[in-house]
């Protein structure tokens, strides 16, 4: 497929020349019942839809997208040839670009013209779709990796032993054995219920906000010349917004995971008892212990994770598009690559900010049976951790964290990217 169309080819698809086409495209919302054609223009519109260029493209769409495309084409054509008594602005939505090769290239060509921009509708349903996709991705990925998350929290909270430089996995194996002896397989899923309640809105807000910030910063899947910094900035802001919303649930989750199951509490009872205990001891501010540390850690993590994934994805799509001589938007990344890019970006971000996460987690879990120590704040926690355990203590739990993060983020991106496809999102 050529990278751009000639003027003759575009003219064969569009019912007018460039300037007239662009001058008549404005943002508006108008139901089909408001389209009023003269008999002659109604025939002309139908002829264009049945013409060889558009008919071939429409035949490649499913029924729903075909109906939507025909509706929007009639809307656009109506603006070019309106009834004298019905002068309105028209709308050309982003759905026109959906997997229709000729029209996709037409729009890309028009958007790059120096004398004006082509305005595309921002469909609100698409915005909701990103949040839904993010929520589903979070639930699936976090449930699959719940045992590793439990191990990570237990290791971070344990201040009684120093990591062994000779046998870095010895502590991990010991903790696994301790958890198994406590309550069998159930011990590895303690806190998973609240984990899901936490991760669903967190992942939903993170991905939804990320897509929104990309649009604000002018980043789209078809833009090739934007600075990579924008992707990292959008990712960092998205993660910070999500962190602010779910931080109280995050604190409660960590405290539950550090609870002693020997008291016979399970399910709702353990959630309610921990919530009441925390509120009685320090009030509502107890739920926000370490929130600034959390945001300081989340911004670089989310920026690295989302920004790196976006960069790897865009780079590889460009390579495949050049190799196969196709438009980049026609390239579909294999699921294996999506998971590999997700695992790499997530692991990189997690390693960079892990010391901050250790401090944050200890501030959140202080005073529990698994972590009885208490701190006066971030600096005090940092000082006591490095004094008692050395700087290696700041990376305590990194091994199970990476074992959890790599598959978790890989699964998350896999589900998210496929959900976007299923919902017809870019």
From Swiss-Prot:
InterPro entries: Mit_carrier, Mitochondrial_sb/sol_carrier, Mt_carrier_dom_sf. GO terms for biological process: ADP transport; ATP transport; mitochondrial ATP transmembrane transport. The chain crosses the membrane at residues 130-151, 193-213, 229-249, 290-310, 336-356, 394-415. GO terms for cellular component: mitochondrial inner membrane; mitochondrion. Its main location: mitochondrion. The keyword Ion transport does not apply. It is a multi-pass membrane protein. The keyword Repeat applies. Signal peptide: none annotated. Belongs to the mitochondrial carrier (TC 2.A.29) family. This is Uncharacterized mitochondrial carrier C12D12.05c. It comes from Schizosaccharomyces pombe (strain 972 / ATCC 24843).
């Amino acid at each position: 497929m050529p990278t751009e169309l000639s003027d003759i080819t575009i003219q064969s698809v569009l019912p007018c020349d460039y300037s007239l086409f662009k001058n008549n495209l404005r943002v508006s919302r108008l139901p089909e019942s408001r389209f009023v054609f003269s008999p002659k223009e109604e025939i002309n519109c139908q002829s264009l839809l049945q013409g060889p260029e558009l008919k071939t493209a429409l035949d490649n769409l499913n029924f729903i997208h075909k109906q939507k495309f025909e509706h929007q084409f009639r809307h656009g054509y109506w603006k070019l040839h309106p009834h004298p008594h019905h002068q309105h602005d028209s709308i050309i939505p982003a759905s026109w670009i959906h997997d229709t090769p000729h029209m996709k290239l037409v729009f890309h060509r028009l958007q790059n013209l120096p004398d004006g921009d082509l305005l595309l509708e921002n469909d609100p349903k698409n915005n909701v779709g990103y949040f839904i996709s993010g929520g589903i991705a979070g639930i699936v990925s976090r449930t699959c990796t719940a045992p590793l998350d439990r191990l990570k929290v237990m290791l971070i909270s344990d201040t009684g032993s120093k990591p062994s430089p000779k046998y870095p996995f010895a502590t991990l194996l010991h903790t696994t054995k301790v958890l198994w002896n406590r309550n069998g397989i159930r011990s590895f899923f303690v806190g998973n219920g609240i984990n899901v309640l936490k991760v669903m809105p967190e992942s939903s807000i993170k991905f939804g906000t990320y897509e929104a910030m990309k649009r604000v910063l002018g980043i789209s899947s078809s833009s090739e010349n934007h600075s990579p910094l924008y992707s990292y900035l959008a990712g960092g802001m998205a993660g910070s917004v999500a962190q602010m919303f779910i931080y109280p649930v995050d604190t409660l989750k960590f405290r539950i995971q550090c609870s002693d199951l020997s008291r016979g509490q399970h399910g709702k009872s353990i959630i309610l008892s921990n919530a009441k205990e925390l509120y009685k001891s320090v009030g509502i501010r107890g739920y926000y212990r370490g929130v600034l540390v959390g945001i300081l850690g989340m911004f670089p993590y989310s920026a690295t994770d989302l920004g790196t994934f976006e960069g790897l994805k865009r780079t590889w799509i460009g390579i495949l598009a050049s190799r196969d001589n196709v438009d980049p938007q026609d390239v579909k990344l294999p699921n294996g690559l999506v998971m590999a890019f997700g695992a790499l970006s997530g692991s990189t971000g997690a390693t960079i900010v892990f010391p901050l996460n250790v401090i944050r987690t200890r501030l959140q879990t202080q005073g529990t049976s698994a972590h009885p120590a208490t701190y006066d704040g971030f600096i005090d926690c940092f000082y006591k951790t490095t004094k008692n355990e050395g700087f290696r203590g700041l990376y305590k739990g990194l091994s199970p964290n990476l074992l959890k993060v790599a598959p978790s983020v890989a699964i998350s991106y896999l589900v998210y990217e496929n959900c976007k496809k299923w919902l017809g999102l870019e």
